[in-house]
From Swiss-Prot:
Record-given protein name: DNA-directed RNA polymerase subunit omega
Native source species: Psychrobacter sp. (strain PRwf-1)
Top-level class of the enzyme under EC nomenclature: transferase
GO molecular function, a single term: DNA-directed RNA polymerase activity
Record's keyword terms, sorted: DNA-directed RNA polymerase, Nucleotidyltransferase, Transcription, Transferase
Subunit-structure text: The RNAP catalytic core consists of 2 alpha, 1 beta, 1 beta' and 1 omega subunit. When a sigma factor is associated with the core the holoenzyme is formed, which can initiate transcription.
GO cellular component, one term: DNA-directed RNA polymerase complex
Pfam families attached to this UniProt entry: RNA_pol_Rpb6 (PF01192)
InterPro entries xref list: DNA-dir_RNA_pol_omega, Pol_omega/Rpo6/RPB6, RPB6/omega-like_sf
GO biological process: DNA-templated transcription
Catalytic activity: RNA(n) + a ribonucleoside 5'-triphosphate = RNA(n+1) + diphosphate
Task of the protein: Promotes RNA polymerase assembly. Latches the N- and C-terminal regions of the beta' subunit thereby facilitating its interaction with the beta and alpha subunits.
SUPFAM superfamilies: RPB6/omega subunit-like
Amino acid sequence: MARVTVEDCLHAVDNRFELVLVASKRAHQLAKGVSEPLVEVNNDKPTVLALREIAAGLVTKDILNQPDHHFATNSLDLALSGGQGF
């Protein structure tokens, strides 16, 4: 897919504002390595991957009901956070 538009994604998420929340949460998961991409990467950035996953129907607004993960998983993150997570 050469370009992803908002209209490509609106069949999976009803409104544009919710789409922003879904895409940003999924992009954050991808950027932090919480989960693997569900589409071919093609050298795309996490935000583009998130939108492509939404457009393909692989990610829905149900992602908003998932608990946020604390990303202090490596020793540097733990040291910087004082061992308490973020």
